[in-house]
Amino acid sequence: MNEHRTPSEAKPARMGALARLPVFLALEGKRAVVSGGTPAAAWKVELLSAAGAQVSVYASEMSDDMRQLAADVSRGAINLHERSWRAEDLPGAAGAIGAFEDDEGAAAFAAAARAAGVPVNVIDKPAFCDFS
């Protein structure tokens, strides 16, 4: 038997709580800042580049992975700056990602990004992240 139900009788399943909301950013042609030249930072640079971002990387030392990414012109603009990041590097960026071993460096980077109005992610340090 086919019974007709009204909307109030057929309630949709409700979603449980989420720790994070999955969001996709339109980064085509927008600038992203990465602090760190490590292989982990290179992986983030590769993701940003694949999304069309113009990536500026700041690190006193760059891994081979990072140098190879920057040399691959098919990836788009990946600019390596062989120096530490500065607060003035952040304004106008669509996002900032940092690779820091210590919480002090992570906290300073996150605070500077937020002060510039830039969403920030610190690799493997969720306490300092606005997004993952």
Pin down the residues of each PLM region.
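Glycine/serine-rich phosphate-binding loop and adjoining beta1-alpha1 elements at the start
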Residues: 1-26
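NAD(P)-binding Rossmann-fold cofactor-contacting core
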Residues: 43, 51-71
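ADP-ribose/adenylate-binding Rossmann-like module
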Residues: 95-101, 106-131
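Structural motif
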Residues: 31, 94-95
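Glycine-rich adenosine-cofactor-binding loop
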Residues: 20-49, 59
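Short loop/edge segments at beta-strand edges and connector loops
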Residues: 59, 80-84, 124
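Hydrophobic beta-strand scaffold residues
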Residues: 55, 80, 119-120
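Glycine-rich, highly charged phosphate/nucleotide-binding loops
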Residues: 74-91
